[in-house]
Each structure stands twice: as C-alpha cells, then as structure tokens.
Amino acid sequence: MDGFAGSLDDSVSAASTSDVQDRLSALELRVQQQEDEITVLKAALADVLRRLAISEDQVATVRKAVPSKGPATLREALSMSCITNGGAGTRKPSHASSVAKKDTLSSAAKSVKRSSTLEKSHNSWDASEESRNKLMRAASTSKLTSKVSKATDKHKDIVISPEGEYIKMFMRGRPITMFIPSDVENYDDVRTELPPEKLKLEWVFGYRGRDCRANVYLLPTGEIVYFIASVVVLFNYEERTQRHYLGHTDCVKCIAVHPDKIRIATGQIAGVDKDGRPLQPHVRVWDSVSLSTLQVIGLGTFERGVGCLAFSKADSGVHLSVIDDSNEHMLTVWDWQKKSKIAEIKTTNEVVLAVEFHPTDAGTIVTCGKSHIFFWTWSGNSLARKQGIFGKYEKPKFVQCLAFLANGDVLAGDSGGIMLIWSKTNVESTASKGAKVLGVYQISKQIKAHDGSVFTLCQMRNGMLLTGGGKDRKVIMWDHDLNPEREIEVPDQYGTIRAVAEGKGDQFLVGTSRNFILRGTFNDGFQVEVQGHTDELWGLATHPFKDLLLTCAQDKQVCLWNSVDHSLEWTRVLDEPGHCADFHPTGTVVAIGTHSGRWFVLDAETRDLVSIHTDGNEQLSVMRYSVDGALLAVGSHDNFIYLYNVSENGRKYSRYGKCTGHSSYITHLDWSPDNQYIMSNSGDYEILYWDIPSGCKLIRNRSECKDINWTTYTCVLGFQVFGVWPEGSDGTDINALVRSHNRKVIALADDFCKVHLFQYPCSKPKAPSHKYSAHSSHVTNVSFTHNDGHLISTGGKDMSIMQWRLIEKVSHSQNDNIAESSSAVNSPVVSEKVLQPDTPTTLPQAVNKATEVEQTPAESMAPPEDALELEAQQPQDLDDVQSGKSSPLPEEANGQEPSDEVIEEPANSQIVDAQDENQDDDDAPLS
C-alpha cells in the first residue's frame, strides 16, 4: 500500500514538474516577443528623432538666411514650402502613404502608389506618433521618452507670427500656416466656448443582419427590437417611431429577450479607446420600457466579445448564460440580478454559434457550433459536458440553431438543411455491463427541411415552428408533428435569411443578410420595414431645400432617404462603389463620385442617369457645385481638382480646367460666394487657394484669401476650424467637418466613433465640444439638413446612418443661452428648444444622458472598470431631476448611459465582411 502511495506521489510530482517547465517555456517565449517589440519601437523612435532633428535644422537654416521683416510674399512662399515639404525647397510630389493616411475605402482604388489599408495602421514603422506614445508608457525606455516628450511638446505648440498676421499649428511635426482674418484685431482675445446647441438621436437607418443571427424580436410594446452599430433600436412600425438604448460602448453582437418579454440582454465586443487602451466586452441587461440599465455583467471576464447569450426559462429568467469570443469560448452562468458568476467552463476551440437553457429542465444547457452539439449538466457551480452522439447519422459541418419541442426533445438545424431531433436516452455503460448511464442525448429523427443550411428556428406561441433557410431563402411553417404546412420564399434582392421571429397575429419577421427586416405573412408576402447599406459607407449629401438626404457606399447602392417620414424614396445600383456626392443647387440632379475616377449625375426624382464622366483612374474624394451651380469641382486622389462648366440645370457638363499644385490627394474643398475661388485640403496637410476665372491658378500669396467668407466650410484645416483637432492627432483622425448654414456650429466626424459639435468659429486649440456616441466604427461623414434642424452622420464599417435633432438648451435662470457642462445635473431646470426656423416652439424633453461634453482631452480617458460598473447602478433620477418628473414615461425616457470612453473597433473584433449573399452560407457561419 505504501509502495502504491509512493508511486502515486512520484507520478504527481513528475506531472507537476512538467507543467512548471511548460509554463516557464511559455513565459520565456512571451518575454522574447516583448523584447522584440521593444526593439522595434526603439528603432521607430530613433527614426522619429532623426526626422525631427533634420526638420528643425532645415527650418533654422531658412530663418537665418531670410530676414524676418522681409516682404510678405517671400515669407508666404517659405511658409508654403514648409507645409508641403517639412522644410525649405521646391514642392515635390509625395505619395499619400507618406503621411500614413488612413483610407478605409482604398480597396477599390487601382493606384498602388497611394493605396492604404482599410483600417488605421498601427504599424510602428509608419505610425511614429503611436510609437512615441507607447514608449512614453514603457519604463525600460525612460531615457528616450524625455527626448520624445520635449520634441512632441514643441511641435504641438501654436506659433503666432510677431506681426500677428498668421498662426501656425503642427501636425506630425509639420507646420501648417493659417492667416488671421482682418476682423480679428487681437488673437489673444479670441474665445471658443461650448455651443448652446446639442444633439439628440432621433432616427437610425439600417440593421446589422449581414454577419449576425437571431437578432430580431417583437416586444409586447409592439416594437421590433434589433441592433446596428452600438445602438439597440426599438422600432414601432405602425406608429413609425423609434426609441434607442445607447448604453453600449462598441458593436452590439447579440441579443436575448427575457421570458417576461420586458427585460433584454445585449452583448458587445471589446473596444479600444483613442489612446489604444482596451475597453472590456460586457453584457448589459436593461428594461425595454424605461430603457434603464439594470445590470452590467462580465467586465473583466469576457475576452474579445460576447458571441451569444440566453436567459433561463425553467426558473423564469433568473439566470443568464453567456459564451464569449475567446479561443476557448468560455461558457459562464450568471445570477444576473446579483451580478454574480455561478459557473464557468471551457466549451471548445471551435466556433460556437448558439446557447440555450432547456425550458423545462433547469439543469440543462445546450450549445452548438462547428461539428458539435454539447449538452451541459449544470449543478451549483459545476458544469459537466455531454457530447451529442451522431451515431449512424452524418456529422454536419455546423449545427446552426436550437429550439425545444413540447416533449422536451431538442431540435437543432444544421448546415446540410437537416433538422435533427435529439432525445434523452439511457445508454449501457461499457465499463460495467448492465449499468445504465442516464441523460445521454442521441438523434431520434432527422428531417430534410431546406436546401442549404437551416439558419434559424422559431418556436411560435401556438406550438407551431418556423424555420429559415440560408441558400433557398425559404420560411417554412411546421405543425406539431413537424410536418411542413406552409412556405414562402424571400425575394432574392433581400438576401438570405438571418433571423425569423413571430409577429402580430399570423405575421412573422425576417432579418436578412442584405440588412433588411421584412414583415410578412404566408398569404400576402413581405413588406420592407427596415433597410440599409451592406458595405462601408462614406458618401453623404443633403438636399438644398427639401428634407432629403442621399447616401452612397461600397455596396454600389445610391439611396435617397426622406428625413421626415424616415423612408427610402428610391435606390439605384451603380456599376462601381460610390464615395462622395453633392446636390446641384436647384436640387434637380446629384453628382456621385466613385473609386475609379468615374462620376455619375442622376436625376434626383427619377434616379435616371443624366451624365457620366471620367477624371483620372483613382478614387474621387469630393464633389462640390459652386453657389450658382455653374461650375462643378471634382477632387481626386490623383492630386488634381477638375473643373466643369455646368448648364441646363445640371444636365450638361464640359471640362473647364484643372487645378494642379497639391502634393497629395484631395480631401476637402469649398467655394467662395462669388464662385471665384476654391479652398482645398490634401493628405499632406496643405491649405491651398485657387483663382478659377484666371485659369484655375494657384494663389501664391495666400493672405489674399484670409477674409473670404466661404459659402460652405467642409475643409478640416483652416483658421476658422483648426481648434477642432485633438492634441497629438496624426492628421487622419478627422474624416469630415461641416459648418451649419446659420454659421453657429461645426459638426465633426472622427475615427473614434464620435460625432462632435463645436462652436463656430473654432480658432483656439483644444476647443471644447459636445460629443456623442452611437456609431461603433469610424464616423465617415456629417451634413446638416437644409434648415439646420437635423444633423446626419454616417458610419464606415458599421454601415449606419444616424439622424440627430439639434436642440438648444435654454436655462430659465439666465437670460442668455448657456451650454451645459458635464455637471449639468446640478444646474437649474433646463428645457430644450428644437432648432427649426419655422417652428420656434419650445418642447420639454428628458435630458440626454448619453451626451458627452469634452472640456479637455483628458476627459476622453477611459474610466476604470468599477466606474463603468457604477454606470449601470445609477438611477434614472438624473433625467427626473432635469425634467422635473418623478418617473419618466416610456416614450420620454432616453435610456442613454453616460460614457466618457472614446473607442474604436479592435483589430481582433472587426466587423467581418460576409461572403457574397448569393453564395451558400453553410461553411461560413455567423456568430
């Protein structure tokens, strides 16, 4: 006996030693990888310091050679030389990649020399600014960081000329000269404050169906609940109203409805703030009536994101099961009301697509995914796995979805179009003959249901079953004995089926891969309730005098939307992806630029093709009509601005000229009121001015243009707007900017999922702004409607269109309009005034808790974990205090959570591109 114990101890000791050695080897490998990364960062830093030193030497040499009180034209020429080359000398063309410009739509461009990645590059060799930031946080490089800090601070300073004629800001160490207008007598007296106007999310166009599943449900309130970007939308299709839950900080990926049909759980992916720090994935449980957050679950527990989740049914929804997107796809069970994790276990390294509690057996949880279905026995804090036995049946590539029959059997749909019925049986144990092992699930029956995959199963209230097919696009209704009764095919233009849910009466809802939500019956067919773009979205234009907006995207669709009834007026598919657009001043036609250099003119009412032209073979980045509509400027990635004469109300075009002089691709441009001049920006941070009647000549003395009152202001670089740039920006953080027609505010779209509202003009660095979260990807464009009543913003990868209402905050305790600060909950009662020139009625509304006020860049720092957890525990009294109500009505509650994070999509949790919708989806399941 002692010998047996000794041998057992030896084996345990040997196993322990082996485990320690494995762990040591893993640690050594990790240390080596970190050392390699530090080496790369040091090399990048050395290159940055070298470039800064060369630039400083060149500038110093020029200043010594030229008297400071020389002629203005000479000083201006030197300033332009510095801007384009970083030092003295003649202007030389440079590649767009020289400034590491993030160009998310360049995948369609054919040019190699200016191609760039779809996401912002984090390569340490290119992103020198990021390399410096990382090294400043590394203790092992403390000596180097002091030098970097000094150099960085020097180039972030704003320099004013001794004569007060111009001001310089620095972007990635490069000077940008902006001349001060004559009406600014003393720049030191210029003040930039928060604007009194604020934004409130009014409508969201679009639905995320392309790469998600089982994410459409009908609530007892009559609302369809679904998500897109970081917004969960509650849409009442009968009343044409929307409410929004805005508690999430990044992409929402999954949703589960509590058995009471009131409470909802939604899970999101991990995020990254603008400083590169991770924001943790989590699940939020919230009330669909009040839109208040009940719990925030899983902070610090989940990795990468939340893949799927489900409420328990046998115990009336006390528990919540969650599977994350880590390599092990961890299954956790929570008492969500107590926010306590009860059990946790690894599931599999393969993809997991669904998790469900058994509706009658409280101790059983079922998960399925790639080539597996697992039945988990849950008792206390333990989970035991039993694998489903396929036996004589062919094992499918994927088990896609789950449902439960009235007798307790488990129904699963697979990628081969088969419905499998799993029954609990008694199986003889091979270890002990005659013994019984209870609770083993085996296939008792299989039914051929669809051609292609069975993508979704929906158990109806009357016991009937709805199934949705992938390849065949069919919705089939099955009776209690699983015999098919009715079927209907979703038209091809809507894509394949992603979700099916029971609707009112005999209606049902269908979510599709082309981002449609359809409402239909087997007798009457389908009606479109929600639709949106299916690929990255950049092009946006608002009608000059109607409540219409036009969008174009990489999906080749051009869509005209009505901003009043929130409907689609028309859509047209182009031959190429669209990137930019502008309405003719008459509103009769719209010009659309594409990725190949071609541009189209469409009739704004009939969508007929009016004209087609080609300028170069690279992406067109901006289309802009002159004020009188007689000229059209086309900005291209080939560094040129093409000018066209326009006649017959925008129906006839002839080449007028070409502006040549930019050293990088055109990003933005604006016209003067007299149609004589153009101001343009480029990827090399240039601000150039052009005299159009004189043959599109470059104006060398840019001070001549300092007093032009530009008709529009969309250029992101200029004296009136340079204060919008955040500290430490690399010049690519702002994708779009627009000034309101009343010239009071500036709206801005940035790379950190935020929409900002600044005061205009914004001529002081680090200007404060109101900032808003709803997008979950870089915000690509913004535009005010014709009467400044609304702001439209578009998301890139999230493919969403957000419509915000402008509201002016008016304090009853003061005579003037005062912009609220982040501590506005302690201020006097505030009312909201909708900014509509023709309807100045004051409407009391609940205060938007999701509104973020950016006082300093420090406020954009991510809060600690406990701060985000506390966010869920804050009562809705904040709204009550400001609105003067004891409890908000359902239609008045915003349900918007305060959030100071500035986040962008993590590299490992990007919105994936689904395969072609006409392709069979069986081998590429969507989690």
From Swiss-Prot:
Signal peptide: none annotated. The keyword rRNA processing does not apply. GO terms for molecular function: microtubule binding. Residues 85-132, 815-927 are annotated as: Disordered. Keywords: Cell cycle, Cell division, Coiled coil, Cytoplasm, Cytoskeleton, Microtubule, Mitosis, Repeat, WD repeat. Its main location: cytoplasm. Residues 914-927 have a biased composition (Acidic residues). Residues 14-63 form a coiled coil. Residues 1-189 are annotated as: Microtubule-binding. The keyword ATP-binding does not apply. GO terms for biological process: attachment of spindle microtubules to kinetochore; cell division; microtubule cytoskeleton organization; mitotic metaphase chromosome alignment. PANTHER family: ECHINODERM MICROTUBULE-ASSOCIATED PROTEIN-LIKE 4 (PTHR13720:SF11), WD-40 REPEAT PROTEIN (PTHR13720). Essential for the formation and stability of microtubules (MTs). Required for the organization of the mitotic spindle and for the proper attachment of kinetochores to MTs. Promotes the recruitment of NUDC to the mitotic spindle for mitotic progression. This is Echinoderm microtubule-associated protein-like 4. The lineage of its organism: Eukaryota, Metazoa, Chordata, Craniata, Vertebrata. The gene is eml4.
